[in-house]
Structure formats: C-alpha cells, structure tokens
Amino acid sequence: MATIAFHLLSAVGLRIGENHKRSLGSPSRRLSVSVTAFSSDQWRFPDHEQRSAKSFWDYLDAARDFIRPEHNSPSRWFSPLETKAPCHGSPLLLFLPGIDGNGLGLIRQHQKLGQMFDIWCLHIPPSNRSTFTDLVEMVETTVQSENQRSPGKPIYLVGESLGACIALAVAACNPQIDLVLILSNPATSFGNSSLQHLAPLVKVLPDQLDLAFPSVLSLIPGGPIKRMIAHWVRGLPENETAANIYQDLVTTSSFTSILADTFRRETLLWKLMLLDAAALFANAHLHLVQAQTLILSSGNDQILPSTCEGKRLRKKLPKCEVRSFKDNGHCLFLEDGIDLVSIIKATSFYRRGSHQDYISDYIPPTISEFNKCYGVNRLLEVIMGPVFLSTTEDGKMVRGLGGIPSEGPVLLVGNHMLLASDKISLPGQFVHERNINLRPLVHPMMFTRLKDGLLPDVSVYDTLRMMGSVPISATHLHNLLSAKSHILLFPGGIREALHRKGEEYKLMWPEKAEFVRAAAKFGAKIVPFCGVGEDDFLRVVVDYNDQIKVPIVKEVLKSVTAEGPVVR
C-alpha cells in the first residue's frame, strides 16, 4: 500500500492562519468540471481566461448604445451577448445596477460569470422616472415567475448601491423564495453620506452650469494619476506607461458627452430622490430579510461610507457575511483585480440547488486563482522547507508524490502537526506535482460561526475553501468517496493540532475509525501518512492546562469555544 511521509525541515514564525426578456436562444451546453483530478498533465486555462479581459473603457463604449433620447422609456431586462450559454443547471443571476442604471456594471465579469449563471441585467434608461416601488415590483415579478419555473434552484440578486437596496426590498417581501444576495456598497448608508446634501445644492445652481462631468468623474474608478502609478508599479516601460496614460486621457475626453447624457441635472435630482427612498425602505425592512447575503465593502468608497455600512448590515442580517476591499472605490465590479467569480467560489456562495453541495457545486480554481491563493503563503513555504516522500506499489521510497494513486477514490489519513500548518502545504503540493485537486475535510468553524466573538473572521479561510476544503461530516465523506475524489483527513482534528506539552507526535484519533468502514464501502485506497519535523523545532511553552488556571483566560477560552460548532 502506498504511503507518504511529510517532513518539515524548519518551522519558524508559524501562524493560524418588454419587462421579461429571455436569454439568448442558443442551445445549452454543459461545462465539464472535474472535482477530483484534472485529466491533462498540465493545469489548463478555462476558455474564459484565454480571452482578453474587458476594461472600464469597454464599459463606457458599451454605454453609448444604452443612452437613448426617448422620454420615460421603460426599464427592461437584457442578457449579455458574451455570456453565451451557461452550463447545465445553472442558477439565474439578476444584476441590479447602481445609480448609473445602464446595467453594464458587470461587463468585466460577464464572460466568467456566464460559465456559472444565466445572467439577466436590468437596464434603467436615464429618462426613466420609475419610483423605487415600481422597480421593486418589476424585479419581484421576475423573481416570482422564475421561481415558479425552476422552484428547486436559487435566484441570485447582485446589486450595487441602488440595486442593493432593490435586492434587499425584494428579499424582505419574498422570504419564501430561495434568494442569494450579493451586494456591493449598498446605498442603505445614503442617510450617512454626503450625497444627501447634494440635492438642495443642485436645485439652486444655475441651469447653465453643467454638473454632469465632474459628478460622474467622481464615480470613475482609477483616475489617470492612479492608473499611472499602477502602471509604474507593474514595471511597464516609461514610454508604454505614457502611452497608456495618454490613451486614458483621450478616452475620457471622448466620452464626456456620453457621461453628461447619463447624469443631466434633472436626472441627477431624480436619482438622488430615488436613493433616499430606497435607503428608507430597505432599512425599514431589514428585519424581514432571511436570504443568504454577501456584502462587498470598498474601503476607499468616496460616495458612500461602505465600510461602516458593511459592519452594520452584518449585525442586522441573520445570514450575512462581509468581505472588505480596503483599496477599492465605489464601482467595485469595474475595478482592476476584482473577480466576482473568484469571490463567490472562495466564500462558498455558489450552489445550484436549495442546499449547498460541496461536491457537485464545487468548481476547482483556475491557474490564476491557484497562484493568487498560494502567493500569500509562498514565504511560509520557503521557511518551512517541506520535503515529500512516498512509497510506490513495489515498496520503493521515492522523493515526491509519485506513489500516490492517480485514480480515486483515495483517502489520505495522517496526523496534524502543531498549528495545522500541513493543511497549507499538502493541497498545493498535490496540484504542483500531480495536478490532483485534494479535498481536505476541515473543522466547520472555517465555514460558519454560532456567534460573533474572538475567533478570526471566516474570511481568513477563503483560500482553503477556494482549494476545495469541505466541512467534516460523515455525509460529506460519503459523498466525496462516491465522487471518486482524493480526500485529506486528519482524524485527530483541532485537538491534535493544538496539542499540549509532552504530546509531541501523539495521535489523538477516536477509538472507532469510521473512515475505514466508509472507505471499504467504496473500494477506496487508504494512504496513511505522517508529518514530522515541526515538533523538533517548536516547543509548547504554555498549553491549555496552564491557561485555564488563570480565571480571566479560562472564561475567554470558554467564550471562544462556544463560538464555533462542535464536531465531536
């Protein structure tokens, strides 16, 4: 039987880490996604990563066709052409725009999102004077209709600023419908922003004063100076940097008239009144929202106090998580480096059915996502210097993971080293060396909290979730084995990772190893492994037994323990 040994040469500084338009009529195609191992010798880029990425200026170019002179033209749904056909069984995603209203806020995300969702975008023409109630009723009608058509699937509402308020209102009025809300910089904070004082100022200014261009420029992510700095940091040649900045300036100037048409004086006044009504309604009905919610807050939002608002909504909504982006501005989805698909995958917010299925709903990371996940741990890898040894079927010990079976189901069972640093190294090494997507079974506290407290936020575990970690349970082990996955199991759990003085290399496994029976049921290969080295370099100075002797620390430990779910 194949075995694997895992050595840490050194370990220093470790830490724990028409109002109803159908989508395009092309035949549906299935996106083939492996949940165990990739078939090729090299990790392939998905189709959507091979295409050139769209920029903010593509957004402006597309906006030209969405600005019409018609008086009070109706709001409507449209499906982006570049999304083509989603994979089989994909849920519906309704994008609800911000104050611009054109519905193109996800243009930089369309290609990747189109692989996972059936995307509809709401377009609110500049001349449209629908009230907030009208917009809520329109979205509500669509949600109810699609829920009747596909009752077993969730409906995603992705909204920014104004659209986030619409999404909250629809969720509050329809608690019986399975909705997933992804809200970027919600305008529920309008009452605490400087925007509320803008309407009286606009009313008293002369008609000849054109406010459109400076107002819209404040919404544009990454002005010329910021973009120039970004180009310099990336190490572009000076002449190329100058060319990029010149193109930015020329493009901005060319679209002045388009931006002005979007935010005429009367339109701006209407939008401000709309935001005021939206914030009042949404805030008054927050207690009715039961939908699963993800708040995306920009730390550099110059329009709304989004950071504080994200924290407030986290306390108000029962099923809410928050992700913060401290260096980004108001138009989050249009900024460089923001990938909504990666955010959804890392937060485990993607599902095709009424409940989260960590096997069928899981989509492995792309090569760029993998590099981003493990880039932050590269220094730790260098410091630890892990060495992997495995035994082939003929009993020969080889360096690397050559002895690990390629075909699943395979169950790797081993010991936790101090602070569970092994959970960082093992999945990455399997990808680098064998192109195998290892599925670790981890403590449920990495996915949920029973209450807020001293434990680190679940966002610190986004990397592990992106790489395929699954909350440990008998059901999940059964499903992973049936899917022929490569599974990583530490029977000793967190108790073994936080072992006490004198417990170096001591196994703390349960008396009944139920995983053996489960593996036998599916004919899985059990690969035992051991991790050694870390306990030879680190010593536990103060352990749990010492800490509980201090009354204050004892109470803190009890409080922390109560925050997370109990496994056994």
What are these regions (language model features)?
Residues 1-30, 35-37:
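N-terminal chloroplast transit peptides
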